[in-house]
Amino acid sequence: MFSGIRIHYALNILEAHGITPFLEFCKRAQAKKGVGVKDLFEIDANFTQALSLAKVAQSNGIEHSKIPKLKEILNSVPGKALIFTSYRDSVNMIHSQLNEMGISAGILIGKAGDTGLKQKKQIEVVQKFRDGEFQVLVATRVGEEGLDIAEVNQVIFYDNVPSSIRFIQRRGRTGRKDTGKLVVLIAKNTIDETYYWIGKRKITAAKSMGSKMTKVLEKNKDPSVKTGLDAFI
């Protein structure tokens, strides 16, 4: 059961993020002691073959089909861009790929245990982005809220989240003062696509609830109309 969960999670990373994040996850998982670890990395022939093929792909410079698309998108719209991804290993991989393309980029990740950026460092990175020291900022969830990130010309979702709130927060980082562009990268028939539609449905449901609440509040302005909680259902 535990091995099955690991395989499922690893597959999602491989499909939605890329070869390097997948291999980094496997490296950490293999170092852990627990039920199913040996079975997964030494006995399961299918998984060991997948791991071997991933290493060959990495050595040949293969990462994910999103990467060349990312380059195309960044080159099509001049100005600053903010790239969101939920996975830290993806941040490092994307940053490395952008540097190889000659695109100046910075990293913004949260602090977790002994890894990540402390708040002071996060603020420094954001300020450098605002000052134009680099044109692209690759961020995890910490970039979605809290920090005062400068206006950007486009926001790119490298992955998708099944949350209407996080979708809106990500999207809200562009188009504040002028027209901005939003690009959502989706690996077809993967968790990416599933999360995208879950998030969209939740946004639609939230808008519907907001509309109902507005109508009820307008009715309540009339003292002769009494409305209970049933009106929201």
Q: Which residues does each predicted region cover?
A:
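Long, largely alpha-helical accessory region at the distal end of helicase-like NTP-driven motors
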Residues: 1, 213-233
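Helicase motor interdomain insertion/brace
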Residues: 1-96, 100
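Well-ordered alpha-helical segments embedded in enzymatic catalytic cores
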Residues: 65-73, 121-125, 142
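Conserved helicase ATPase core of P-loop NTP-dependent helicases/translocases
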Residues: 80-84, 90-141
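Alpha-helical elements of the RecA-like P-loop NTPase motor core of helicases
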Residues: 92, 96, 145, 165, ...
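Conserved RecA-like helicase motor core of SF1/SF2 enzymes
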Residues: 110-112, 116-117, 134-135, 141-177, ...
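Conserved segment of the helicase C-terminal RecA-like domain
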Residues: 130, 171-203
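Acidic, Ser/Thr-rich peripheral helices and adjacent loops at domain boundaries
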Residues: 202-211
